[in-house]
Design a protein with these regions (language model features):
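Helix-turn-helix DNA-binding segment
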Residues: 306-316
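Structured, helix-rich domain cores that form ligand/interaction pockets
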Residues: 1-300, 328-353
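Short, solvent-exposed alpha-helical "recognition" segments
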Residues: 317-332
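Residue-level recognition of well-ordered secondary-structure positions
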Residues: 80, 221, 313-314, 320
Length: 353
């Protein structure tokens, strides 16, 4: 059967939302799956909680992220899960088309019963990982280009992880202003040890693994209501507002972080034209082309006085120009950035399953 992933709709790998605790009921004989907390004064049941990572039995039943916390006194319930809750339809991700299916799978797994229609009406989201999988092999050349095309290297921290992944974080302390974009090789990630129990659980592991061949995942993490409203351009985080929010969120975030080579004329001449250019290039190589590390090293060595910010800025502009020139000559950075932008703009793709 062939299913279509509508990329014009928002898709999420992880969601967390609040709803009424009246929307949950336990399944007879499965009450032990939940942790029960009693009110110390009244002796009445106050809180029930399910955490798929709490113990070995829960992990065997649900080998992926699922968290349910219902407070009977405050009448509030928090539910968080990953798109693996879609089971065989995992590649479809969480969207307006699959959200109800994910909720119903909680009962299918024998955990509890949920009033899914009521949840749709009253839920509000406070955590989302906006996600898109694109047909692109995440090569070393692409990773190097992304490192060097960070428009404002002071604004975003980046780090490589798992060999074929890169994470960009906005360098701020305020939680509502924090931004995190992860780009990684999904074909490699789906085969890691943490995903093996999930693949054993579903009936179509071969199809799921085949779907992610030569796929790169782009994932924007949003951890507060204010951030969600800002990025999705919505007035609140109710169900329909979120699911029908800004469909270009990942493209816009990509454009916020990455720019084409800022000094294209520099690549039209020889890269090294003297000893000064040579020392700049050696400095870049020593620090693996991490501009932020270079700037911090200059500060640590006190090469410029506290009143010489302009001089430091001029020096860093020379370093940055050399980095962009090298990047364009060696990787054709502009075409790589534009190719990624086009893929993030693509409308739909087919899923064989």
């Amino acid at each position: 059967m062939r299913k279509t992933i509508n990329s014009n709709k928002l898709q999420f790998d992880t969601v967390r939302f609040c709803t009424s605790s009246d929307n949950i009921s336990l399944i007879e004989g499965k009450e032990h799956l939940f942790k029960h907390t009693l009110d110390m004064e009244t002796g009445e049941l106050s809180i029930i909680e399910f955490n798929s990572q709490a113990n070995q039995n829960n992990r065997a039943l649900v080998p992926f992220s699922l968290y349910i916390h219902a407070n009977r006194q405050s009448k509030r319930m928090t539910i968080e899960f990953s798109s693996k809750l879609l089971l065989e339809d995992y590649p479809l991700l969480i969207s307006e088309d699959t959200f109800l299916q994910a909720l119903r799978n909680i009962e299918r797994l024998g955990i509890c019963k949920l009033n899914v229609e009521a949840i749709i009406e009253d839920c509000s989201f406070n955590k989302l990982h906006a996600t898109k999988d694109v047909d692109m092999e995440l090569t070393e050349s692409i990773l190097d280009t992304l490192n060097l095309c960070t428009g404002d290297y002071r604004r975003y921290n980046w780090k490589r992880y798992m060999g074929e992944s890169i994470c960009f974080k906005k360098d701020v302390k305020t939680k509502d202003c924090q931004e995190e974009l992860n780009i990684y090789n999904k074909e490699v990630e789906i085969l890691t040890g943490k995903n093996k129990p999930f693949l054993k659980m579903v009936s179509n592991p071969t199809e799921i693994m085949a779907h992610y061949e030569k796929k790169t995942r782009f994932e924007l993490k949003m951890g507060t209501k204010r951030m969600i409203m800002k990025k999705l351009k919505i007035s609140d985080t109710s169900y329909y507002n979120v699911m029908r929010g800004n469909p270009n969120i990942l493209l816009e975030q990509f454009d916020c972080i990455f720019t084409p080579s800022a000094n294209s004329n520099a690549a039209d001449t020889s890269l090294i034209n003297g000893f000064t250019d040579y020392t700049l290039f050696c400095t870049l190589c020593f620090h693996k082309f991490n501009l932020k590390t270079i700037e911090q090293d200059i500060k640590d060595r006190r090469l410029y006085g506290p009143n010489s910010r302009c001089a430091l800025g001029r020096a860093m502009n020379k370093v940055k120009s050399m980095a962009h020139a090298w990047n364009k000559q060696s990787t054709n950075a502009n075409s790589i950035i534009e190719e990624i932008r086009e893929k993030l703009e693509s409308k739909s793709m087919n899923l064989q399953g």
